[in-house]
């Protein structure tokens, strides 16, 4: 039954209010919605505060190490015990003993050892009181029976507080998918984690994508141990694909994963093709087989640099696989350690490997232990030893190598000077002739003595190189007469000429290359290794800077020689000579002099002559008193340059010598104009400085 609106009883306190509401609410539009809709539309209004009030406050991120400032051991132990009581979990006595032994809390502590302790979720949560106050180099969580919850909590703590650089989580078989997910997040976010040991911790199909993504995007890991982690199949495929883009991982250990010779080995071969930063690959105790070795060799062949250590111990390899490896070794440039132990290679396999080893120049360590070798195989190995200039260690233990093989190895060591360690069985092998046993003992001793001899030779060579480097790193500056530049220096040049020295400075080879780093270093090193000489005697067929003085003027009272050895670039000796007057010389002895007037002084005077001839004195103008610009005479034509200038200035010198003394005097002005027009400003300034000083000395 409907009640008319006018008969409805009014509510308490609503006299007039209920009637006024519809009067105030309506808006003036004729097509307006009902009254309830109009009320709701009017209530929705949005306003924004002013720019000054739009940000009400700011919160800085929490410092993870805010609890580690000025902390003491007692505070750490007290906080840990309080957390254990709060979480109702047992305390770890092994942890408490280690905490009491810590002294230097301001730096990373060497190790936190929790190996063998059972860590459930609550126990792991209590460890946060330690991790928030201390950082460690090594955190050992091996065989701690971690479950998914405990592992996730621990890995989150280690990531947040950067608690460790080396983390061992091996032998934890129940960390599960969430545990591996937290571990992957830790690997990706932690910049200090360099080493992760996850041996015997299964990385299954549903967990591998997290780890692969962490290694592909960004990771600071340099060493990763995944032995016995059930990687064969899809996990290895994901891991190898991710590592193709990884440039930080240096060592990868994949032993005991039952890797096969088809899909798994193909993935590893592709990894080696694209990854040049991986240095150690350990594949021991797998099923690579000869077919898998072919894939790996294909990847190695395409590497120009990269893998340095390859361990193929116990992979059922035979002589067929050694043929693949023998063809690959000549193309490898970085492989230094190759371990083929416990594979039935046999004598034929070593023969297949021999030529590749001889052609290779990078292998330093070779492992052939327990490879079914006999004396025949030892002879092939001896041939490689005799030809190898770099081999350092060779392992031939657990092989049937008897007298004949030992004799071949002994003879090879007599011509080899690099092998430092040759591992053989200590006990001699049984022989039909009893006297051969004594022969084996003598040969074993001889082989050992040969290795000791090589060791002594290597040590002596290293000490000699160190002494040479030490002597080369000491700068030497030798001044023939330690006087100021303003004073005349007559004695050094006079003594040099009295002793018959051809000139006080080196020839063009050492002078023109003084500013270059890459030329004539070997020659300079050889000269310096013999004896550090203050001055170098130039060759008779070259002209040195000391021969630039005019023949008409004695060079002894105006020359100053300073020899400086520079150990930085080739250890060369540079000689700077200051001359009294502008240089002038006859033609060099290499091109034959054209026929001219018969006059002994007109020919090129030997550089050893200390005094000028009368004709030379007549043909050369006297410098006289010092003038502002005396270098009006042309510089000498030839490789040497004045005052050790750069070799680029040689382009400004005239290539043809004057035919005689008359032409020499007549062409002085022309040669000077050509040289001054082509030389740079530095040449003019240096010549001006030299002439001014020489003028002061003549006064």
Swiss-Prot record:
Gene3D superfamilies attached to this UniProt entry: Ribonuclease Inhibitor (3.80.10.10)
Region (Disordered) location: 1-42, 467-667
InterPro entries xrefs: Leu-rich_rpt, LRR_dom_sf, PP1-Reg/Actin-Interact_Protein
Sites bearing Phosphoserine, chain numbering: 50, 56, 566
Gene Ontology molecular function: any one: protein phosphatase inhibitor activity
Domain of life: Eukaryota
Residue ranges of LRR repeats: 220-240, 248-269, 277-297, 306-326, 334-354
Pfam family membership, one: LRR_6
Keyword Transcription: no
Biased composition (Acidic residues): 510-525
Keyword set includes Repeat: yes
UniProt biased composition (Pro residues): 1-12, 588-613, 622-642
UniProt KW keywords: Leucine-rich repeat, Phosphoprotein, Protein phosphatase inhibitor, Repeat
Role according to the record: Inhibits phosphatase activity of protein phosphatase 1 (PP1) complexes.
PANTHER family assigned to the protein according to its UniProt record, in alphabetical order: LEUCINE-RICH REPEAT, ISOFORM F-RELATED, PROTEIN PHOSPHATASE 1 REGULATORY SUBUNIT 37
Annotated family: Belongs to the PPP1R37 family.
Subunit structure: Interacts with PPP1CA.
Protein known as: Protein phosphatase 1 regulatory subunit 37
Lineage: Eukaryota, Metazoa, Chordata, Craniata, Vertebrata
Gene name per UniProt: PPP1R37
């Amino acid at each position: 039954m409907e009640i008319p609106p006018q008969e409805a009883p009014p509510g308490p306190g609503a006299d007039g209010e209920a009637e006024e509401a519809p009067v105030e609410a309506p808006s003036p539009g004729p097509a307006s919605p009902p009254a309830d809709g109009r009320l709701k539309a009017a209530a929705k209004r949005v306003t924004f505060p002013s720019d000054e009030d739009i940000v009400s406050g700011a919160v800085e991120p929490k410092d993870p190490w805010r609890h580690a400032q000025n902390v003491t051991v007692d505070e750490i132990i007290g906080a840990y015990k309080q957390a254990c009581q709060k979480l109702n979990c047992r305390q770890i006595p092994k942890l408490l003993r280690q905490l009491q032994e810590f002294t230097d809390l301001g730096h990373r502590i060497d190790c936190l050892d929790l190996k063998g302790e059972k860590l459930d979720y609550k126990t792991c949560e209590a460890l946060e009181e330690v991790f928030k106050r201390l950082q460690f180099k090594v955190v050992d969580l091996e065989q701690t029976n971690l479950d998914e919850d405990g592992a996730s909590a621990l890995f989150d703590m280690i990531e947040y507080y950067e608690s460790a650089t080396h983390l061992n989580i091996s032998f934890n078989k129940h960390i599960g998918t969430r545990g591996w997910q937290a571990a992957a997040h830790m690997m990706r976010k932690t910049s200090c984690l360099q080493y992760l040991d996850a041996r015997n911790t299964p990385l299954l199909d549903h967990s591998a994508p997290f780890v692969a993504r962490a290694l592909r995007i960004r990771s600071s890991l340099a060493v990763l141990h995944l032995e016995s982690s059930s990687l064969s199949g899809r996990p290895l495929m994901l891991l190898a694909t991710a590592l193709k883009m990884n440039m930080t991982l240096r060592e990868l250990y994949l032993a005991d994963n039952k890797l096969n010779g088809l899909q798994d080995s193909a993935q590893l071969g592709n990894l080696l093709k694209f990854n040049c930063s991986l240095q150690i690959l350990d594949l021991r105790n797998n099923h690579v087989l000869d077919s898998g070795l072919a894939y790996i060799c294909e990847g190695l062949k395409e590497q120009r640099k990269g893998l340095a250590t390859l361990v193929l111990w116990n992979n059922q390899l035979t002589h067929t696989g050694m043929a693949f490896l023998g063809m690959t070794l000549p193309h490898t440039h970085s492989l230094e350690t190759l371990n083929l132990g416990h594979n039935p290679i046999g004598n034929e396999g070593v023969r297949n490997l021999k030529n590749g080893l001889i052609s290779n120049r990078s292998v330093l360590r070779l492992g052939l232990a327990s490879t079914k070798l006999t004396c025949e195989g030892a002879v092939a190995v001896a041939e490689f030893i005799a030809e190898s200039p770099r081999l350092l260690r060779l392992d031939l233990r657990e092989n049937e190598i008897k007298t004949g093989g030992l004799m071949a190895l002994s003879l090879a060591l007599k011509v080899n000077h690099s092998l430092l360690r040759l591992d053989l069985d200590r006990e001699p092998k049984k022989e039909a002739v009893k006297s051969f046993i004594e022969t084996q003992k003598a040969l074993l001793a001889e082989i050992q003595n040969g290795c000791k001899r090589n060791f002594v030779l290597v040590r002596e060579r290293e000490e000699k190189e160190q002494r040479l480097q030490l002597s080369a790193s000491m700068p030497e500056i030798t001044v023939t007469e330690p006087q100021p530049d303003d004073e005349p220096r007559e004695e050094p040049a006079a003594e040099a000429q009295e002793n018959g020295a051809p000139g006080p400075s080196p020839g063009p080879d050492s002078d023109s290359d003084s500013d270059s780093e890459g030329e004539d270093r070997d020659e300079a090193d050889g000269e310096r290794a013999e004896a550090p000489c203050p001055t170098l005697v130039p060759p008779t067929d070259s002209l040195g800077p000391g021969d630039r003085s005019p023949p008409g003027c004695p060079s002894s009272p105006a020359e100053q020689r300073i020899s400086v050895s520079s150990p930085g670039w080739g250890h060369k000796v540079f000689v700077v000579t200051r001359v009294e007057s502008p240089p002038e010389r006859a033609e060099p002895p290499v091109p034959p002099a054209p026929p001219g007037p018969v006059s002994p002084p007109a020919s090129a005077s030997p550089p050893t002559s200390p005094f000028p001839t009368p004709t030379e004195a007549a043909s050369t103008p006297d410098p006289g008193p010092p003038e502002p610009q005396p270098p009006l005479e042309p510089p000498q034509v030839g490789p040497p340059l004045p005052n050790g200038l750069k070799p680029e200035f040689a382009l400004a010198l005239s290539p043809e010598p004057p035919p005689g003394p008359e032409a020499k005097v007549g062409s002085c002005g022309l040669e000077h104009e050509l040289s001054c027009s082509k030389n740079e400003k530095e040449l003019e300034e240096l010549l001006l400085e030299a002439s001014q000083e020489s003028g002061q000395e003549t006064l």
